[in-house]
Amino acid sequence: MHTLVLLRHGQSAWNLENRFTGWTDVDLSPEGEQEARDAARLLTDEGLTFDVCHTSVLTRAIRTLYIVQHEMGLSWLPVHKHWRLNERHYGGLQGLDKAETAARFGEEQVFEWRRSYDTPPPPLPADDPRSPAGDARYAGLAPDVLPASESLKETVARVLPYWHDVIAPQVLAGQRVLVAAHGNSLRALVMHLDGMTPEAVTKLNIPTGLPLVYTLDGTLRPLAHRYLGDPAVAEAKAKAVAAQGAARK
């Protein structure tokens, strides 16, 4: 049997402000930092430890991982950062208030952009200052690789090569792996691991700061998976994620 832990970053400054974030690089909020410390405690209480860690190239996921490592006394572990684990790119929605966007375009349209499987938000123009093209962390990538917007389907297609090429071989080799990433990049992994349909994954909400522990067999099929901590907390956090696209009443 193999162990894999998936962890969505703690609350970010823009989660707190209910803004579309995507590839925008924002930091954790104070609550997000505490969520990372709490995640470390849950992992320690469960008796879990790790051999290798993976995260995106975005600060909120990196800092979540570093806080967890520090709290667990595992700061020495190797960390692999990769853009393929980034959050879904929200295109022209990035930076906008989710509730105000719902009031402007309608909740149904915003739900389609946020939660559908194959509908991307409006793309960013190439010369938009929010474009990743001028960001040094993506300097080695061909311009046509960088997204201007992504559907969840496109996010899955971006994430899975990293799973197949890097993470899965480590898990199969017996390494205990922690992946600290984002709501949609983790939805992509969960969809693959659990064999979820596109319709099912649109209803999946990943709560912030709660470790999701998978026990996998020798072919990486899930034998069990669960969030650590109080199930009621996980359910409440997942419902809060689902409600983010609603207009203010």
UniProtKB/Swiss-Prot annotation:
Pathway where this protein functions: Carbohydrate degradation; glycolysis; pyruvate from D-glyceraldehyde 3-phosphate: step 3/5
Q: What class of enzyme is it?
A: isomerase
Q: Does the keyword Isomerase apply?
A: yes
One of the entry's Gene Ontology molecular-function terms is: phosphoglycerate mutase activity
Instruction: Give the record's keywords alphabetically.
Output: Gluconeogenesis, Glycolysis, Isomerase
Site Transition state stabilizer: which residues? H182
Binding of substrate, residues:
8-15, 21-22, 60, 87-90, 98, 114-115, 183-184
**Origin superkingdom:** Bacteria
- What single Pfam family name could you report for this chain, choosing any that match? His_Phos_1
Protein's GO biological process:
gluconeogenesis; glycolytic process
Q: Where is this region: Disordered?
A: 115-137
Instruction: Give the positions the UniProt entry annotates as the active site.
Output: H9 (tele-phosphohistidine intermediate), E87 (proton donor/acceptor)
Give the enzyme's EC designation.
5.4.2.11
Q: Which family does it belong to?
A: Belongs to the phosphoglycerate mutase family. BPG-dependent PGAM subfamily.
Subunit structure of this chain's protein = Homodimer.
For this entry, the protein name equals: 2,3-bisphosphoglycerate-dependent phosphoglycerate mutase
Q: Which organism is it from?
A: Nitratidesulfovibrio vulgaris (strain DSM 19637 / Miyazaki F)
Upper lineage is:
Bacteria, Pseudomonadati, Thermodesulfobacteriota, Desulfovibrionia, Desulfovibrionales
